[in-house]
Amino acid sequence: MARKPGLAPKKVPLQKLNKTNPNFSNRQKQIQRSKQEDEHRKKLEEIPEDNTSHMFFSYNEALVPPYHVIIDTNFINFSISHKLDIIHSLMDCLYAKCIPYISDCVAAEIERLGSKFKVALKISKDPRFQRLTCSHKGTYADDCIINRITMHRMFIVATCDADLRRRIRKIPGVPIVYLKGKKYTVERMPDLLQ
């Protein structure tokens, strides 16, 4: 659409943004928050992952009997549904004594599942299972397990969660126990016969 000659566009009065205007302070706060979030994201991206490449073709020498096994929520649930005793089945699978560990995040996740999973809650409170206290905020169990095994590579992770297993495979030297058929299977543990 062509403009008629001689007509000037309407001027819309702009609000003055100064320190007395409430929109100014809100806008400044939004800008400050976005800058802080960007800085936080950059810091997270800059943190190098400590993937030890010397462990790529060998196994983790910190894994010695008795094995320390971190157990995930769905591993407990699948073991119950297949009527497997967790501790005895782990010992049969790994051919050695095992010490099962449950983090506070996993226990909180089981409690949140409700009355349908009373048996899983009872198993998680078994005195044979060691409790790992969590110092972080939030109760997302997968992140808790990933953080713990990246810090200390002395654990074997027992999970049936495909996404968690995919994330663990990126960390060298951490074996995974999962349910295959009606028995436990170990992945990335070279000294065991599969």
Swiss-Prot record:
Annotated Polar residues bias: 17-33
What main location does UniProt list?
nucleus
Species assigned in the record: Dictyostelium discoideum
Q: Name one GO biological process term.
A: ribosomal small subunit biogenesis
Name the keywords, alphabetized: Nucleus, Ribosome biogenesis, rRNA processing
One Gene Ontology cellular component annotation held by this UniProt entry: small-subunit processome
Per its UniProt record, what InterPro entries does this chain match?
Fcf1/Utp23, Fcf1_PIN, PIN-like_dom_sf, PIN_dom
Task: Write out the function statement from the record.
Answer: Part of the small subunit (SSU) processome, first precursor of the small eukaryotic ribosomal subunit. During the assembly of the SSU processome in the nucleolus, many ribosome biogenesis factors, an RNA chaperone and ribosomal proteins associate with the nascent pre-rRNA and work in concert to generate RNA folding, modifications, rearrangements and cleavage as well as targeted degradation of pre-ribosomal RNA by the RNA exosome.
Pfam families noted in UniProt: Fcf1 (PF04900)
Segments of this protein annotated with the region Disordered: 1-41
SMART domains from the entry?
A: PINc
Q: Which family does it belong to?
A: Belongs to the UTP23/FCF1 family. FCF1 subfamily.
Locate the PINc domain: which residues? 67-166
This protein is called what?
Answer: rRNA-processing protein FCF1 homolog
Assembly and interaction partners: Part of the small subunit (SSU) processome, composed of more than 70 proteins and the RNA chaperone small nucleolar RNA (snoRNA) U3.
Q: What subcellular locations does the record give? A: Nucleus, Nucleolus
